[in-house]
Amino acid sequence: MAKNNQSAKARMGAIGESLVVAKLMQQGWDAFNANCTIKNYKSIDIICLNSDLREDGDLRWKPKTALVQVKTCNQKNIPIGFTMEQTQDIKYLEDNVKGPYVLIYREEKDGGSKYRFFVISRKDFIKLAYELHHWYIHDWEREKPLVLSAPAGFPIKNLMGEDEKETSRHKAFHNPFKGITFEDKWENIWKE
């Protein structure tokens, strides 16, 4: 990737993270960017605190904390930060998905940008990553073998709760979240 493309991609990511911090604060929650102190902190972009909720057990004195990962993209299949092979290892996902995800689709319209936010809990992220990519790996007819080290992504239609219909190239994908949209579901920040 050319240096200017890397800069543009980094800028888009920084814009997405800043927009998410603002959205979280609009909900009445405290939030800050973890990347302000460590460049591209692994698996965590934003730390969010909700003083109205408390942690469980011995930590009930502490405000509820969410470790949020943000992915921003201008494609309708948003990369999720894992390879297709990694999505098929539930233990790996459980160890590496630290909290909820906010996936942002940036669309260029009328000379400006419009942003759509998809907020998915940690548990739902793991379930969708596994099931969607299991289907993509095993239920497609291909002339060439699939490269499992390729990036995995979530198509917007699946984040909107839509299935994939059967075609001559693949079986149908039955979305485990059929009819449930993750768009603007900020309350998912606090769900496991």
Pin down the residues of each PLM region.
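Mixed-charge (Asp/Glu-Lys/Arg
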Residues: 1-42, 47-192
